[in-house]
Amino acid sequence: MAPRKPKVVSVTKKKKVVEETIKVTVTEEGDPCVITETANDQETQDLTFSIPVGENVTTVEIPVEVPDERSLPVGENVTTVKIPVDDRDESSPQPPETPVEVRDEPSPQPPETPASKSEGTLKKTDKVEKKQENKKKKKKKKRDDLAGDEYRRYVYKVMKQVHPDLGITSKAMTVVNMFMGDMFERIAQEAARLSDYTKRRTLSSREIEAAVRLVLPGELSRHAVAEGSKAVSNFVGYDSRKR
């Protein structure tokens, strides 16, 4: 869309100059006599200005002086004319007006007061204590899981080998488990006493076999020693067979 041309209004300014003649005569008495003569409408000057009428105008004040050596103007011989000047170029397109967004600034929040050092240290100590308690609980659970089977697994396997059709209750299995634990404790105590007699700090197979014969009765002790020596020989010779 082409820009609109501004409207032009012509203004005519007329200036009227009044000429005044002053005659001064001095008499013998010493009193001066002043005579003034005025001549009106001696010069008339027409000033024509073209004033464009537009939307965006700027007002500029231009003083105009018309000097005349022959005439003495009344008052200041200056005419002030306001000429609106259009800043826009007719050929240049008008730039589109950009909308201005008004954003609501968030109200400033009061600064947060830092927590005291004592509260921070208390929180840290509480966290450390909770972590330690959790670790202890995990260790206890692992121990319970490991000690839960104890000798039950081995006793059940041996029982199925000897009597595959025979079953056993959980209470009977706990009794057998406790019996096996007590028996091994007594064997360890007897072996420790024998090592004290020989003044040795390391238990050997001799002390273990002697402790088994002392704890278990006759035939059971001989069977246990034979099976134990067989298991040890198999364990030691496993690497040689693997090669």
UniProtKB/Swiss-Prot annotation:
Keyword Acetylation included in the entry's annotation: yes
Residues modified as N-methylalanine: A2
Entry-annotated residues carrying N,N-dimethylalanine: A2
Keyword Isomerase applies: no
Gene3D superfamilies in the record: Histone, subunit A (1.10.20.10)
Protein name: Histone H2B.2
Family membership: Belongs to the histone H2B family.
